[in-house]
Amino acid sequence: MQLTLDRLTKQYGSKIALDRIDATFEPGIYGLLGANGAGKTTMMRLICDILKPTSGEVTFNGTNIREMGESYRAAIGYLPQDFGYYPNFTAMNFLLYMASLKGLNARYAKEKSLELLETVNLSEVKDKKIKTFSGGMKQRLGIAQAFLNNPQILILDEPTAGL
């Protein structure tokens, strides 16, 4: 597995958020550190194919991710900085909904959701509505959804916020 950023640039109007970034990621754990506004979230969104680069490219195992489409997105698990929860969903319903968006079959989705709720210590509240959860509980639920599809690449933007 290799993820490569090649002269990756993102510009918003006259503001350059990322300027010709080159990096190669092999299997391992990486952290991005930088000041507010340094472009960390922008870089993660480019890696996740949420944003289109102004120039440069992101490749996964030698192929441009923009050409890979669904097959690339299936390899990604992503927890955004400001995750959108559905307050009237239960934890279980939320994970099942996210699993359906990721194209997972219903039986697997239920088994994996129960497993992940146990892993993030939310199994006892799986039938409670998300609006009753603390910030930390919501964050753990977000982490669980990022693992639903057994991703090859896991991108977590401020994963400890609210814990």
Predicted regions and their residues:
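Conserved ABC transporter NBD signature motif
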Residues: 56-67, 71-72
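Helix-to-loop junction immediately C-terminal to a conserved catalytic motif
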Residues: 48
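Catalytic Walker B motif of ABC-type/P-loop ATPase nucleotide-binding domains
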Residues: 154-157
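Conserved ABC ATPase signature
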Residues: 129-133
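Conserved ABC ATPase "signature" region
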Residues: 96, 100, 107-125
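Conserved catalytic motifs of ABC-family nucleotide-binding domains
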Residues: 150
